[in-house]
């Protein structure tokens, strides 16, 4: 494995998820205090578990694997680090409708990967990552 990163939820996402505790408590309190606290705690813990279990992984060996996407390194033309401001434009007004995007809103940096496969209409892939330089280096160093 040349590169591996798990895209864990950010502190902000976890803070927002923790707000489900008082909401669940208020919703379940009419059924009794014990039931209310049990539902609130179990519901919030379940939400945290779901957030961590469903966190996607980026890995690079002979293929780039992100979620269900799998791309052979041999069809990658280039990989470049994208910062916050450029990322906003790239996935917004300057986006190509044929591009593949794997974006997490709580991760502010990404890598843009040009695809050189003549059989694939996808011009590029944009992947959110907290370690864009390392991912770009791993992709470019192992293309052949």
What positions do the PLM features span?
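Pocket-edge structural micro-motifs
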Residues: 5, 115, 129
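Hydrophobic, well-ordered secondary-structure segments
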Residues: 18-20, 44-45, 56, 112-116
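Non-transmembrane, membrane-adjacent beta-strand/coil modules in membrane-associated proteins
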Residues: 68-126
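Conserved beta-hairpin
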Residues: 42-80
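Short, aromatic-rich membrane-interface segments at the entry and exit
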Residues: 31-40
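Cytosol-/stroma-facing membrane-proximal "stalk/adaptor" domains immediately downstream
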Residues: 130-144
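N-terminal membrane-targeting/pre-transmembrane regions
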Residues: 1-28
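Short acidic, gly/pro-rich beta-turn/loop elements at beta-sheet edges
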Residues: 13-15, 123, 135-137
